[in-house]
């Protein structure tokens, strides 16, 4: 990545935010950089990124940290359970960021987690403030 890392935000309506971040990840892995993607909304059910990430190890680590989509796709979990998972995801982010093991960390759907009230904006600001200088940090999600 770069000598001074960036904070990049992909937001807006429609599709393409996660895809853009994955494009950055693929490029980084091509340069033998270490990448971690922490997904705030997607749960552990099977989806394409899981299969792709296995092919990119050890340079790419995917952590599906969410409980799953909130209030859709047959979700019956109480909001408090989604909040607990999101708060645990924030702790995972802190650990990964402070480990200085990664060149690029993607916080997928973190913006949407804030919008839904699963985490507060201050916790996101703290992640940004505490990132190592060389780390590229990508935040995705609508809102």
Regions found by a protein language model. Give the residues of each.
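Positively charged, low-complexity intrinsically disordered leader regions
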Residues: 1-2
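Conserved P-loop
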Residues: 5-95
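Proline-centered loop/turn at the N-terminus of a beta-strand
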Residues: 34, 134-136
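Short, polar loop motifs at secondary-structure junctions
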Residues: 142-143
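Phosphate-binding/switch loop-helix module in NTP-utilizing enzymes
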Residues: 73-133
């Amino acid at each position: 990545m770069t000598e001074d890392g960036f904070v990049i935000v992909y937001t807006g309506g429609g599709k393409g935010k996660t895809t853009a971040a994955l494009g950055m990840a693929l490029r980084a892995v091509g340069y033998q950089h270490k990448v971690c993607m922490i997904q705030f909304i997607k749960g552990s059910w099977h989806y394409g990124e899981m299969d792709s990430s296995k092919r990119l190890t050890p340079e790419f680590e995917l952590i599906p940290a969410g409980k799953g989509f909130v209030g859709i796709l047959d979700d019956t979990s109480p909001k408090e359970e989604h909040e607990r998972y999101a708060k645990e995801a924030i702790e995972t982010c802190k650990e990964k960021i402070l480990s200085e093991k990664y060149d690029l960390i993607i916080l997928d759907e973190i913006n949407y987690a804030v919008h839904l009230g699963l985490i507060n904006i201050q916790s996101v600001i703290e992640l940004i403030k505490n990132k190592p200088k060389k780390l590229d940090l990508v935040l995705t999600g609508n809102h």
